[in-house]
Every structure is written in C-alpha cells, then in structure tokens.
C-alpha cells in the first residue's frame, strides 16, 4: 500500500514487527498517466491512495483515467455525488497478470481530515488492519458490500423477502401503518437551573453509535406480520409495530427534566418496553407483530463494534491520533449507511425492510434512556441531548472527571469527550439555553464556539 503525492510515493511496511516508512521519488515520466502506472507497477504496489491536495488528484477525472496506455485496461468507479470524478480506478495489465488500484479519497465522501501523506497512509492502514479488507469505494458502496459479506452465512434472501407489501400495511381504518414514523432519538434541551448557572463549564460527550449497538441484540421480524386489533398480542419480545397512547405518569422523562417520548403514536416493540421501563403508562390500541424473529445483523454489527473497540483499547498500536479519528469516523459511516439500506426500497438498491429499521430505532431509544437514567442515578442531569451526544454543566474543567463514572473505566465503553476543552459557561452560552432557537442551531453554535477555542 502507498500514498501518492506530487513528488513521491510513500510506502508503509512492517520490519521486525514495527511499521516503517519508505519514500520513492517520482520520475519525470510520472507526469503522464501511462508513465505513472508503469512506475507504480515497478514498485510492486497493488493499491495506492492519492493525496487529495496533490495535483494528480485535482486533475483526475473519470474520462482522463479511461485514457490509460495500451498496456492497461481501466475500470473506473465514479463518485455517486459527482459522476465525472472518480472514487477509485482499477487497472488491469493487458494479460491480466497485474492489478493496480488508485483510490481517490477526495471524491469518495469519507469525512477524513488529511493534513499530510502520513495521515492518509495511517488511516488506510488502520482500516485495512481492523476490517481485513480494502475499502476504496464510496461510503454507500462500501457499506452495501460489507453488509452483504458479513451476512452471507445467514439465509439473507429468505429473511429479507416479506410476503406482504410493508409500505401499504393497513391499520384498522385502512390507512398505511407509518413504519418510518419511528424516530431514532430526541433533540432536546432545557433551561439551566439557578445552581447550574453558577457552574463554570459546559462539557459535551458523544457515544460512538447507539444504532450499531442496537443491531447487536435487536430482534427482527420474519414471515407474515399478524394484525392484533386490540394490541393484546404484545408480549415485549416479538418484533412489532404498535399504535399506543402514552402518559408520563410522573416519569422524569417528561421533556422538562429529561427528554421524553410522549408525542409518538406508532412505535416498535423495543420502544414500548422502554416506555414502560421509564415509568410511562402505555395503552396499546392496535398493532402488528411478526411471529418469527432473528438477529440477522448481529455478526455485522459486532464486527464493526469490535473494529473500533480494537483501535480505542490498543491505541499503542494505532498511535496516529488523526488517523485513528478518521478510521473511527469511517466505521461509523459504514454503520450509518448499512442501517439506512434497510429501509430503502428495493428499486433504490435497499432491502425494503422499514419494519427492521423501526425495531432498531426503538432499541436506540431504550439504550439512550438507560444511559440517561444511569447518569441521573450518579448525580448528573444533562441540559442538552442531540442524537448520540449530550451536554452537562460542571465546575470541573476536566472532561474525564466531570461526569462521575462515565470515562473512568480503563476500557473503551463507547463514550468520548465531545470537546477537547470545555466551553466556559459565559453569558453568551447561557443565553442559548434561555432563547427559543431550535436545538439543531444551538448545537451548531456550541460546536463552532468549541472549535474556536480548541488549541492548535
């Protein structure tokens, strides 16, 4: 594996159990595509990542790469967002004895920060190591490939096919059941209390991916969904989608003290169980359930979770901080796009299982509320929750000790500080919690302020 810059080919290897770098100066002939391919073949590399800031990356187009010399047959993969630009190009020698892949992260859609060639080489190396495969395509294509590969041992085609059209599944009155009405988590904030206003710092914490965590144990439906007109078939185990009436009944998950889940009418089995666990009164009015269930996504989700866990727990083997961040972000993207495939229609390349997506979303709610309940028992009340992130105020400037028990474990538990340096609880910050700005805008403002105050 190597990284191509304007002047050199940077190669990574292992000598005596240690990673070493080697540099090869590009010849003048490398200014032409045919000369570059010949040079790379002579170096014995089979995959090369092109540094986004290089002139070669900036002038590369799909049509230009198609004009390789007579010695090579190019297979160019275009970017889904910009079809004229390449995500990768596979070059086969005329006799097919040699294969060479050029990858263009500038156009693939990975959210990588790459200040230099070493950060790109380390990022690609870490991903190869934890995924045991090359990921040179776009996030969508790579996620589809990985999800397919890691579920091969299961009867995927049999489990994926629904005997009925899930998009038109009728309720008692003949209206389509809104399988995609289930949301994956709240965006919520509350005003600061007087005591909180006297604190000095605002900390942000993120969780890697509750959606991926949910996929490790969620039950997914198989077979023909069965109508339960009065909801009496609900048992808290079988996958289902249920029309409910929720009452907070004194629960602190009331959208005032903590985020709530009171405004949803159709929710999945894991979400119903979650609502009862946090003290809601739940009246099930009707619903559908699946008589058979399985955990098709468990092996895929566990593989991705263990990949990021390996990097976090063995940081001495993954020493490049930015590359480790890039690789972790890549694993999260693979999870996001893989889960999104479940509810995409088949004619759009998806699995057409919105019911599976609903079960995962409901399980996400359960995991979030369990985490929030644990924080409260330990004496911490979040002031803002958005997806997998939450914010707290504290007199402690250290993010590793500001929330008791959250980051004290020696092994990675999914949580990480969202801000390297906490925000000072200034009047400007406090005013954000007094105003009427949407939560999303408040989050963006806070993140921008934190970025401005992060040391270089």
Regions found by a protein language model. Name each.
Residues 2-456:
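Conserved acidic
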């Amino acid at each position: 594996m190597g990284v191509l810059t304007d002047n050199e080919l940077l190669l990574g290897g292992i000598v005596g159990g240690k990673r070493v770098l080697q540099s090869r100066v590009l010849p003048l002939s490398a200014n032409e595509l045919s000369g570059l391919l010949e040079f790379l073949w002579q170096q014995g590399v089979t995959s090369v990542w092109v540094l986004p800031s290089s002139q070669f990356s900036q002038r590369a187009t799909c049509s230009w790469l198609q004009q390789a010399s007579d010695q090579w047959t190019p297979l160019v993969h275009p970017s889904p967002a910009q079809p004229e630009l390449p995500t990768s190009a596979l070059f086969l020698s005329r006799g097919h004895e040699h294969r060479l892949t050029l990858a263009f992260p500038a156009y693939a859609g990975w959210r990588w920060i790459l200040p230099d060639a070493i950060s790109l080489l380390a990022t690609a190396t870490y991903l190869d190591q934890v995924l045991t495969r090359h990921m040179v395509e776009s996030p969508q294509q790579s996620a589809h490939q990985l999800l397919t590969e890691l579920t091969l041992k299961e009867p995927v085609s049999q489990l994926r096919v629904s005997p009925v059209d899930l998009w038109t599944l009728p309720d008692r009155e003949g209206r389509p059941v809104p399988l995609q009405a289930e949301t994956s988590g709240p965006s919520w904030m509350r005003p600061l209390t007087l005591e909180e206003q006297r604190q000095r710092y605002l900390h942000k914490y993120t969780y890697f991916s509750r959606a991926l965590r949910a996929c490790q144990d969620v039950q997914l439906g198989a077979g023909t969904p069965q109508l339960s007109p009065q909801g009496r078939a609900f048992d808290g185990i079988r996958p289902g989608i249920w029309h409910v009436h929720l009452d907070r009944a004194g629960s602190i998950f009331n959208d005032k003290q903590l985020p709530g889940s009171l405004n949803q009418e159709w929710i999945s089995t894991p979400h119903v169980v979650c609502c009862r666990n946090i003290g809601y009164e739940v009246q099930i009015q009707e619903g559908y359930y699946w008589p058979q269930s399985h955990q098709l996504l468990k092996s895929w989700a566990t593989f991705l979770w263990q990949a990021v866990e390996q990097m976090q727990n063995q940081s001495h083997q993954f020493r490049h901080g930015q590359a480790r961040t890039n690789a972790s972000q890549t694993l999260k993207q693979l999870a996001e796009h893989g889960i999104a495939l479940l509810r995409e229609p088949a004619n759009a390349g998806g699995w057409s299982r919105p019911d599976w997506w609903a079960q995962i979303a409901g399980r996400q709610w359960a995991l979030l509320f369990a985490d929030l309940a644990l924080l409260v028992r330990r004496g911490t009340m979040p002031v803002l929750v958005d997806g997998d992130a939450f914010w707290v105020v504290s007199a402690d400037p250290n993010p590793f000790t500001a929330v008791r028990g959250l980051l004290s474990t020696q092994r990675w538990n999914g949580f990480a500080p969202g801000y390297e340096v906490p925000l000072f609880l200034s009047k400007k910050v406090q005013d954000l919690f007094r105003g009427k700005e949407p939560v999303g805008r408040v989050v963006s403002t806070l993140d921008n302020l934190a970025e401005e105050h992060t040391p270089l």
